[in-house]
Each structure stands twice: as structure tokens, then as C-alpha cells.
Amino acid sequence: MSGEPAPVSVVPPPGEVEAGSGVHIVVEYCKPCGFEATYLELASAVKEEYPGIEIESRLGGTGAFEIEINGQLVFSKLENGGFPYEKDLMEAIRRASNGEPVEKITNSRPPCVIL
């Protein structure tokens, strides 16, 4: 024994599916609006929770921050006026990864705070 810790595998054991695998997310956002940082923050949180997930970004129109899970629109900033709560998105991803129906997210946090 060398006293070195054994390497930790991030690959799931045979027969187990990596969390989020089979789920494809597309986030369409307005880059000139400054929404790229919000996308990157959200994508990082999602990948941490669901390492097997596929996340794709697309540039969208003015004011857009739209999220699709497996081709289904689950959140629209254009409709809701804010951004999704992380917990609501994680729940939608969990449902999709379990093969359950995904409902549209209607709760949203304000896009900015006025002090």
C-alpha cells in the first residue's frame, strides 16, 4: 500500500444510470440582455446535480430566457417575466429523468431587484 487514496470513479457502476442521462435541455437566452451569466450559473448547478444531462444553449430574441426539456417548453421568461427558481427546474429535470410528465414552470423570480 502506498498510502495514497484510491481514485474516485464518477462513472456509475454497471446497471446504474447516471443521474440526468437521457434528458436534453435547451436554454435559449438573450445575450445582449446580459442573460448569459444566468444561463451559465443555471447550467453549472444542473450539471452538478445531474452529471449525465445534456445542456445546449442557443441565442434567442430580445428578453428571451426559454427552457426546453426533451423538446417540451417548460419555462418562458417572455411569458412569466422573470427567471425560474432553481428548485423548480431541478424538480422538472427529476421528473423527466424518471420518465414522468413534466409540467410547465409558472413560478418565477424577478429579473432584478430595485433597492
Swiss-Prot record:
The modification N-acetylserine is found at residue 2. Widely expressed with highest levels in kidney followed by brain and testis. The lineage of its organism: Eukaryota, Metazoa, Chordata, Craniata, Vertebrata. Residues 113-115 form a propeptide. One of its GO terms (biological process) is positive regulation of filopodium assembly. InterPro entries: Selenoprotein_Rdx-typ, SelW_related, Thioredoxin-like_sf. A lipid is attached at residue 112 (S-geranylgeranyl cysteine). It comes from Mus musculus. Increases cell migration by inducing filopodia formation at the leading edge of migrating cells. Plays a role in regulation of apoptosis, possibly through control of CASP3. May be involved in a redox-related process. GO terms for cellular component: cytoplasmic side of plasma membrane; cytosol. It is a lipid-anchor. This is Migration and invasion enhancer 1. It is found in: Cytoplasm, Cytosol; Cell membrane.
